[in-house]
């Protein structure tokens, strides 16, 4: 079958990413022409599909590659129930995925609970939980997400707007582990224009989320009520490209690839330093593990040992420690704890979120729930 240039590019990206994770051709029999059915024990991947142009292009591309390589490929459609048409969109998307040949195709209903982080973040949290939970139940090898080069560039700008730091320039990683489930982003080298072309060439009818602002003319700025990502896409990115006289999507995506290498090297060093300088107390499984609300975690930092590491590594170790304790920390909290490490002169404790504190005694910095608050909580429970 002859594929368009956009589809060929996406297939190439998909092959590279799958092969890099041991998901290459499963048997020589799949090199021969003709239709072949994956073996029952073949690796199994899920495509996360919303019905939008990016995820339908991903589904079509994944099915082509997986069918050719003997890999089982299914789809997960998450219905957030945030819009009136969500049920209809989910059903139509499921049928499109079945028509493409994906099996099984699952619709997963979720309840989005907004707890102060914003509805967009709450929906993302619910979606990832549903994808990871479903993948675990089906023993899937990986979940494929449809983030594109455009999404990568937009993510960098969003992270820079919301926070500062090296990690903001690294964007989204191509590979992530969520609760031991492998999550892959095979289309980070593919543009939204290419996914649109794939859908058009393959005759795939996609759905545009109205909150994306696609129906609003480019010369009209989106109101502040639209999600930040939509406003960055619709307003900021075109302005930056016009101002710079170049394709800022491509420029930012290339920046992300370079910065990602640096960030991963820093993270590896930080993990080594963490293992050597921090001891956790409580039910600690790993830094991404979910804990019960009353399952409080504390940590002891060997300040003398940590002081020997460069500042960039110290900050990452402290940030990981605070995150592992379940604290919604800010950069000022990390800096304040680092002063207990590198500028120690007998100062008092550092107040942290969630009624936690960091206090140094001799060479040990103890991070734990403030004793007064802990006593009150225990009294209420009893």
From Swiss-Prot:
The listed locations are: Cytoplasm
| Keywords assigned by UniProt, alphabetized | ATP-binding, Cytoplasm, Ligase, Nucleotide-binding, tRNA processing
Task: Write out the catalysed reaction.
Answer: cytidine(34) in tRNA(Ile2) + L-lysine + ATP = lysidine(34) in tRNA(Ile2) + AMP + diphosphate + H(+)
Major place of localization?
Answer: cytoplasm
* Record-linked InterPro entries: Rossmann-like_a/b/a_fold, TilS/TtcA_N, tRNA_Ile_lys_synt, tRNA_Ile_lys_synt_N, tRNA_Ile_lys_synt_subst-bd
Top-rank taxon of the source lineage equals Bacteria
One CC-aspect GO term: cytoplasm
Record EC number: 6.3.4.19
The molecular function terms in GO held by this entry are: ATP binding; tRNA(Ile)-lysidine synthase activity
* Positions contributing to ATP binding: 50-55
Q: What class of enzyme is it?
A: ligase
BP term (GO), one:
tRNA modification
Transmembrane spans: none
Q: Which family does it belong to?
A: Belongs to the tRNA(Ile)-lysidine synthase family.
HAMAP family, from UniProt? Answer: tRNA_Ile_lys_synt
Q: What does this protein do?
A: Ligates lysine onto the cytidine present at position 34 of the AUA codon-specific tRNA(Ile) that contains the anticodon CAU, in an ATP-dependent manner. Cytidine is converted to lysidine, thus changing the amino acid specificity of the tRNA from methionine to isoleucine.
For domains, the record's comment is: The N-terminal region contains the highly conserved SGGXDS motif, predicted to be a P-loop motif involved in ATP binding.
User: What protein is this chain from?
Assistant: tRNA(Ile)-lysidine synthase
Q: What is the lineage of its organism?
A: Bacteria, Bacillati, Actinomycetota, Actinomycetes, Bifidobacteriales
Gene this protein is translated from: tilS
């Amino acid at each position: 079958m002859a594929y368009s240039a956009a589809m060929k590019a996406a297939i190439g990206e998909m092959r590279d990413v799958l092969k890099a994770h041991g998901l290459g051709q499963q048997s020589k029999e799949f090199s021969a022409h003709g239709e072949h059915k994956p073996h029952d024990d073949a690796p199994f991947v899920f495509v996360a599909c919303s019905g939008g142009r990016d995820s339908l292009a991903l589904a079509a591309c994944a099915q082509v590659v997986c069918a050719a390589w003997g890999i089982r490929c299914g789809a997960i459609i998450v219905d957030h129930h945030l819009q009136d048409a969500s049920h209809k969109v989910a059903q139509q998307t499921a049928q499109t995925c079945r028509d493409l040949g994906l099996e099984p195709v699952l619709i997963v209903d979720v309840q989005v609970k907004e707890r102060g982080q914003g509805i967009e973040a709450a929906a993302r949290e619910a979606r990832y939980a549903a994808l990871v939970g479903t993948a675990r139940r089906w023993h899937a090898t990986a979940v494929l997400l449809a983030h594109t080069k455009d999404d990568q560039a937009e993510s960098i700008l969003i992270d820079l707007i919301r926070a500062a730091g090296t990690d903001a320039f690294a964007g989204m990683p191509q590979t992530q582990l969520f609760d031991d489930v492998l999550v892959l982003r095979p289309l980070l080298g593919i543009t939204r224009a290419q996914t649109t072309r794939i859908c058009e060439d393959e005759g795939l009818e996609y759905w545009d989320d109205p909150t994306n602002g696609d129906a609003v003319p480019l010369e009209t700025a989106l109101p502040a009520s639209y999600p930040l990502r939509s406003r960055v896409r619709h307003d900021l990115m075109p302005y930056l490209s016009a101002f710079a006289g170049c394709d800022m999507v491509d420029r930012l995506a290339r920046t992300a690839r370079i910065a990602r290498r640096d960030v991963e090297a820093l993270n590896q060093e930080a993990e080594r330093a963490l293992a050597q300088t921090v001891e956790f107390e409580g039910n600690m499984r790993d830094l991404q593990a979910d804990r019960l609300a009353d399952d409080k975690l504390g940590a002891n930092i060997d300040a003398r040992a940590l002081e020997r590491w460069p500042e960039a590594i110290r900050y990452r170790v402290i940030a990981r420690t605070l995150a592992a304790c379940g604290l919604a920390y800010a950069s000022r909290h990390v800096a304040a704890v680092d002063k207990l490490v590198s500028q120690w002169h007998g100062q008092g404790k550092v107040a942290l979120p969630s009624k936690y504190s960091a206090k140094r005694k001799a060479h040990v910095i103890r991070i734990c729930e403030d004793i007064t608050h802990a006593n009150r909580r225990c009294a209420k429970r009893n």
